[in-house]
Amino acid sequence: MLTEDSISHLHGVERPLFVMDQWMYHSRMYAAASYARTRDDLDVIQLNSFGCGLDAVTTDEVSDILTNSGKIYTCLKIDEVNNLGAARIRIRSLISALRVRERKQECRTVESTAYERVVFTEEMRKDYTILCPQMSPIHFDVIEPAFRSCGYHIDVLPDSDRAAIDMGLKYVNNDACYPSLVVVGQIMTAVLSGKYDPDKLAVIITQTGGGCRATNYISFIRRALAKAGHANIPVVSLNLTGLESNPGFKITPGLAFKGLYGLVFGDIFMRVLYRMRPYEKEPGSADRLHQKWLKICQDFVSQKHVSHRRFVQICKGIIEDFDKLPIYEDMKKPRVGVVGEILVKYSPSANNHLVELLESEGAEAVVPELMDFLLYCFKNSEFKADHLGKKRSSARTARLGIIAMEWLRKPAVKALKKSVHFGTPGNIDEMAEQATDCLLYTSPSPRDSTSGRI
């Protein structure tokens, strides 16, 4: 009986892998599996204690490394029951299968573990449809035309239904977290619908670069496409960290500005619509006002060249128009915050239409701005530079990102401050400072070498 760290140094891993290889224990597992696949006298049993979506990522990869070279993969979920009866049965089954193979003297071929991804080229950009999974309809309704105006044939998929969730369960390891099933289910439903030519199709997905399974959405999607016989479909990584590059997709200044304008518009709509709709005197009036301004915003981001002055005017116009919407001023309803994992927080289907449910039950829903998530990502880079030894250059870039985003939404914040009914989003630096009283202290910071506070 050998542990993974006793043999992982004996064989390197042929890269790139399907997954983002960024965790030391899992890297040793991949190396150990790569070595085991080259030998007939060595087999692997992976012990797995379910924690989150990362377990699905790593067990899938170890399975691929072994099974693609004709080896048997066995995974024991050690947290399922208190007794080991089930584990004993699995191990006995493995031993029995190995003996059968030995008697039959089956031959196998050792295959490379490297994955050759399909690159999205400049030629593909001209006539390929790019599928984008839905996350937040109130934002993506504006962001989609922004991408199209920059020459990308983007199709934002409809919000998931039960069929899409079932499709996700079919093509994704069922130990993966729910958002992974939702995203992959949307994409595979569209790919297999017959609506699109699979030879003229690409998929785009964000890739955060963090330790969460969100960095590995892209591997879930590629694995699902390969299972369905569509490994030829390129999957484009939308990231700001240089994880993957595609010649046919580039974040130009024009695309970045239009996308961020759309993000600000979506945040404004979310704040003013959710604030006024529960109190409207005329049912449906808030939604009609939303549709009116949505069309204006879509037309704005669809222009070849956008004016920041016009952006400021639209932000001010939306807020002032909603501020004048007739509502029951004397009515007070409980305000309920909606927080949590990013997709479940913003996607109506993923959260079982929670905002609608709250409003129907006599409450007012409050959902944080999507831009706050991007600000958090930048702030996190500063934290890593202060406490975890990351490059100071990344912290300086992150600070510039925070300054740019706060400047972009400054017109909205200014108009919200002047309004009667609306509050303003919080400042990321102030929130981080306040959080130091709630969170565990880290190692001492350069800014405060005695307390360990940021």
Could you tell me what each predicted segment is?
Residues 1-443, 447, 454:
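An N-terminal assembly and electron-transfer interface module characteristic of large anaerobic redox
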